[in-house]
From Swiss-Prot:
Origin species: Desulfosudis oleivorans (strain DSM 6200 / JCM 39069 / Hxd3) (Desulfococcus oleovorans)
SUPFAM superfamilies: Ribosomal protein L16p/L10e
One Pfam family in the UniProt entry: Ribosomal_L16
Family membership: Belongs to the universal ribosomal protein uL16 family.
Protein name: Large ribosomal subunit protein uL16
Oligomer status and interactors: Part of the 50S ribosomal subunit.
Length: 137
């Protein structure tokens, strides 16, 4: 799964997820893309689950790109522990997602195949998404 090799601090504050995303909101590599339409956090496990769902459906044809990286640590306290007594231990890594962010890109496959692959991938993600296509102008 995806995770940073080295970080300055083990724990981070959650922060606010407001506003839209300007950087990373256009297709850079492929012909088709999956774009987020709401804010949220996507964990490394969810990114990998969506990637596997896509690649299995297209039978490893064409090429896919993952445009997000989980660089924010999230923590969790153990089960049945009372509140307080400090912040929990680091549990995993997540990517902060704002509306407009391109999550995945795909090329070298037909339109219908890409659309269905992204639909299967979207079921694995906690944010609402839409299918986008490169404008040939």
């Amino acid at each position: 799964m995806l995770s940073p090799k080295k970080v300055k601090f083990r724990k981070q504050q959650r922060g606010r997820r407001t506003g839209t995303r300007l950087a990373g909101s256009t297709l850079s590599f492929g012909e088709f893309g999956l774009q987020a339409t709401e804010c949220g956090m996507i964990t490394a496990r969810q990114i990998e689950a969506a990637r596997i769902a896509m690649t299995r459906y297209i039978k490893r044809a064409g090429k896919t790109w993952i445009r997000i990286f989980p660089d924010k640590p999230f923590t969790k306290k153990p089960a049945e522990v009372r509140m307080g007594k400090g912040k929990g231990a680091p549990e995993g890594w997540a990517a902060v997602i704002r509306p407009g962010r391109i999550l995945y890109e795909m090329d070298g496959v037909p339109d219908e195949l890409a659309r269905e692959a992204f639909r299967l991938a979207a079921h694995k993600l906690p944010v609402k998404t839409k299918f986008v296509k490169r404008e040939t102008a």
